[in-house]
């Protein structure tokens, strides 16, 4: 019993001792916390000099500024990401596609030649310098924002003249035609020995060449093959086109004046010729009796043709045989194009009557003067599978000289302003199954041509006339959706006379600052323009081949005028 009581007493003493030590430990911890807080408060007061709530008012502003800096940095990073995406997803694939296109064109050209070696088509395809890869036949300026007329031509640049000139006072070189492909260019003009008005005999100069860059970086045109067709065949109104087999050319063979030809009852003889890469020329007469059975006169459009879908497409115009199926199909058809902000004051019925009469000018005996497009299959056989397209006159004006051209994936037909409408016209053209379809044209109100009254440069009403001059525009500035914004060209800046050639960039209403060939009294005639880019330097150039009056050697000298396209700052 005593032992049990003693054990209980001992346990009570041990429990009291533990409780005492717990209490002492808690007091010690509490004192330590108080001392730590006191020291921390003292240190805080010392370091911040006892900041009050008023001192913290500016903190939200500081935080806001920090947020702005962070947001700006993130935005900058997003711009970088966007540029990287644009480069990787858009620009690089397009560049690769351009390069692929050039390579495929070159391979196609070589393939044609290899397959045609047995037919003397020649080997050794010429190719432009690598600096031009992806810069020929492309949309050169793609810009949705800048004013078209902020682009303008430089002063004319000295370069190698690749065009032969007359060597006597009675010599005449006229009617230049030019076309360039991804691999080579083609050029032709007519040579008359006894003055420009002789229709009975002439030569035809035809050349094939490539674009080169000199050691100092200058552009020049290098002629590799040329021929002077002096064989008693009077070729006229020739159009040339660069194709995978060389330089294809369409000409009429003339033995009478134009007025006499329109008075005849049979079509005009035509030939499809080719200057091959080996320097040999061959040609074949077309079966005009079948192909132009509804025509009394038919001529190539003078301007260059274009190689599209394994066919070469040439502009054609001439007179339809009265009451023939083609003539009957156009009866009553007409179109009226209007000047920008300059309405014709004539009554509508009178305008319609005059518009209809404009297709049958009195100069050609009232024959309907019609626009057409001729496509020919490009093969080692000349004149193969020709197909003639006659567009409706609800789209086209009276048939004049013209040009077919391709830029990027777009095709166009230029119509010379031989009728009442003075501003330059470019019709979008689509091709399908060997035929062409023309659509409502782009018009360039400030790109006019001189003409006789009542169809002078400022004319605004439909009338019957045969006037004007060939001055084609070249598509230069595009929207990103591939629609055309502006063109380059060399116009004759006079109301009635063939005077004052000037080069400029044109939108649908106005023009850029000009580059003048010489004085305003300088005589000139036909001009044909083509633009390209030196990809290595990213510089865009335009070539205007122009007939400029000559006072000593011949009536005209054909001059290749070269400019660089510049841009005004901040426009």
UniProtKB/Swiss-Prot annotation:
UniProt xrefs under SUPFAM superfamilies: Sialidases
Domain of life where this protein originates: Viruses
Subcellular location: Virion membrane; Host cell membrane
Intervals, Intravirion compartment: 1-26
Signal peptide: none
Organism: Newcastle disease virus (strain Italien/45) (NDV)
Protein name as catalogued: Hemagglutinin-neuraminidase
Record-level Gene Ontology MF annotations: exo-alpha-sialidase activity; host cell surface receptor binding
Role this protein plays: Mediates the viral entry into the host cell together with fusion/F protein. Attaches the virus to sialic acid-containing cell receptors and thereby initiates infection. Binding of HN protein to the receptor induces a conformational change that allows the F protein to trigger virion/cell membranes fusion.
Keywords: Disulfide bond, Glycoprotein, Hemagglutinin, Host cell membrane, Host membrane, Host-virus interaction, Hydrolase, Membrane, Signal-anchor, Transmembrane, Transmembrane helix, Viral attachment to host cell, Viral envelope protein, Virion, Virus entry into host cell
